[in-house]
């Protein structure tokens, strides 16, 4: 047991259901297939090499690095596919925000952006995202090796017990008190409570407010967010059931620097993909073994 959070939210990539299917979970090969199907579209609105690289590596970086055994896998086909996809985008410095910026809803609706990043901390957030796309969407998750859904939970208010503590019983009592007295309407509460009784109470409270609605605008796109419905609740519970990991930054900054430094030669056409991934593999392996 590492910690007991008091609240959580959900973090995932989403796309049109017609593009990504109805189930969560996909691989880098699946992402590449989507890109190949829509060669004129971007994966994300206002995408740059940096944003695409970080998004596609954020949840699955550990699959390329085995710190315990000092082994790296940056010469595998999945990583090569990743760099091939990233190569089509401008660098962060090359992207002209004044000239090239497009609001996400406009990019989604025109099908010039295929994916969005969705953060769920309220029962109606899924409804909001679906209306921004103006089409049925699927929480496809971040790409992995195929063994996971790629849908992650972000935790808040985590409490834990020091293994050297001489007062573990008292610590457990404090944790129990914290969970039981975590008020669902507290101004300090973000996302959803982890205690089922509190979660159910929150859902009941939201359903009781079903007649409430509010307007939401993003540039020239305006939508109406309806009060919580049973459909919203069902979609939320289904999404929670798909969560299979914690949203944490797996990326080692030094390894990311190695990747971005060496990949630049491929992006500029100075070296082949195989040459670049071989160099990344070599440098990364040396670094991991020196720091494991």
Name what the model sees in each region:
Residues 1-18, 42, 138-152, 242-250:
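A structural signal for short loop-to-beta-strand junctions that line the ligand-binding cleft
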Residues 1-26, 47-69, 153-161, 254-263:
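Periplasmic solute-binding protein
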Residues 69-100, 138-142:
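Glycine-centered hinge/linker elements that transmit conformational signals in sensory
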Residues 130-201:
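Extracytoplasmic/periplasmic substrate-recognition and gating elements
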Residues 153, 213-284:
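C-terminal capping/gating helix-and-loop segments adjacent to ligand/active sites or protein-protein/ligand interfaces
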